Amino acid sequence: MNTRTTPLIVFICLLFWGCENEAVITASAARLLYDSGNAVFLDVRTKTEYDDGHIESSVHIPVSELPLRYQELEDRKNDHVIVYCRSGNRSRKGTNILLEKGFNAKNMLGGLIEWNNSD
């Protein structure tokens, strides 16, 4: 690794795992992963909310359907799965569902509201 890449990776790791024992990630850290292409983003809001606007290339599975549809993400199980909703409440539930199924999932703190404020 070159000297420019190492600090970025350390920074992402600190932000990503900064909340000890909690499966969370800040919107700023999530944006870094998004920009690097090293994560899949899961929108757990309703279809209407998703259609009104979402993170580009995100996967949409409403949290109410996730217990039956989580297999759609099976090929990304070991990747970073960033779960988001509007503010972070539904995504916490979605994250817990995925964690129980063995996914490497993180709840994006503040949801889409914080994402939009982090650019």
Predicted regions: what is each one?
Residues 2-6, 16-39, 48-80, 86-119:
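Rhodanese-like catalytic fold shared by cysteine-dependent sulfurtransferases
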Residues 41-43:
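Structural scaffold elements adjacent to functional motifs in cytosolic proteins
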Residues 7-11:
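Helix-termini ("caps") and immediately adjacent flexible loops/tails
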